[in-house]
């Protein structure tokens, strides 16, 4: 049963929410789970408030938002802490946030095919199919977002062990995409996030490569 706490501390609660969403969906929706919810599953985080899911298109995002609304979630605009992210509508209930993206995560940093294929686990909840993002892609997303709690999450991911070559490949591929310079501001967020980790005596092997 989903508790009334403003944070989720049991992975079963997340699965229950996905089961309920899947029951309300009239069409199949696939999404990438990328954030604290995956870290909770991996035992790298004690609790999470935000459940971050990235759909592949606007249509699937709208379907998922409609299912959340049918479950009693309120659909609201993003908060200040989401200002770096490409999320436009949140589903909120009991102090918890279901942050639903449609492809774009931050400016022109979006859900790549590589991120989709690197998913570590695929689960079906009725009409909702959830892929768990890799730790490396969660790390990148949290460096960019820099919401309260994201910095310690990044530290925990580094300590758990990351494939920094994979991290760099994804960052480089996203940065080299054709696009306006102003849409590449997310690379500055990553650089700042890495600097903060290094200031806390964590070794980030790709730090020099990211420095602009």
Which sequence ranges carry the predicted segments?
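Compositionally biased terminal segments of proteins
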Residues: 1-212
């Amino acid at each position: 049963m989903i508790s009334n706490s403003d944070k989720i501390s049991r992975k079963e609660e997340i699965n229950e929410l996905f089961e309920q969403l899947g029951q309300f969906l009239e069409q199949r929706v696939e999404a990438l789970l990328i954030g604290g919810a995956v870290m909770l599953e991996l035992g790298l985080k004690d609790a999470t408030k935000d459940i971050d899911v990235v759909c592949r298109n606007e249509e699937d995002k709208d379907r998922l938002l409609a299912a959340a609304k049918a479950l009693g979630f309120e659909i609201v605009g993003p908060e200040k802490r989401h200002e770096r992210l490409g999320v436009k509508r949140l589903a909120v209930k009991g102090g918890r946030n279901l942050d639903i993206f449609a492809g774009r995560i931050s400016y022109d940093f979006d859900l790549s095919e590589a991120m989709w294929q690197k998913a570590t686990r695929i689960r079906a909840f009725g009409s909702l199919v959830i892929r768990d993002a890799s730790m490396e892609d969660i790390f990148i997303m949290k460096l960019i977002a820099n919401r309260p709690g994201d910095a310690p999450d990044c530290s925990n991911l580094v300590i758990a062990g990351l494939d920094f070559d994979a991290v760099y490949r994804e960052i480089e591929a996203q940065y080299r995409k054709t696009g306006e310079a102003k849409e590449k501001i997310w690379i500055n967020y990553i650089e700042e996030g890495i600097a903060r980790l290094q200031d806390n005596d964590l070794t980030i092997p790709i730090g020099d490569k990211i420095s602009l």
